[in-house]
Amino acid sequence: MLELGTTGGAAGDLIKDTSEATFMADVIDASNEVPVIVDFWAPWCGPCKTLGPALEKAVTEARGAVKMVKVNVDENQMIAQQLRIQSIPTVYAFFRGQPVDGFQGAIAGSEIKAFVDRVAAQGGGAPGGGLDEAVTAAE
């Protein structure tokens, strides 16, 4: 089955759906390695249908500098309540287990790219949060 909005095998590693059972591993734990952008959405939400694919495209273009996790708020109400999601779409970015940035509502494509670039920069702007470059520099 082809997932809407993903391209190629690499996107599967960068973009995934999560649930209440896997949120901690998919977002909090994963954000210790690289920033994780979390898209809170619902199937009936018109703006979500526009924002989601645009966000997926920007994350894929970041080539591993960030990951994206999607939360269907209808299926994962506990997560939405705990993070006080009042309207959708809502997007949060997590790094080192903490929310570091975010926005509500649909935004323009240029703003989405700027957001992803800003979040990627917090993690070093490279896959692994710049760890490879730091190790190379230390050697």
For each of these PLM feature ranges, what is it?
Residues Q82-Q86:
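A short glycine-leucine-enriched loop at secondary-structure breakpoints
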Residues M1-R63, Q77-M78, I88-T90, F95-E139:
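Proteins that catalyze or organize thiol-disulfide redox chemistry
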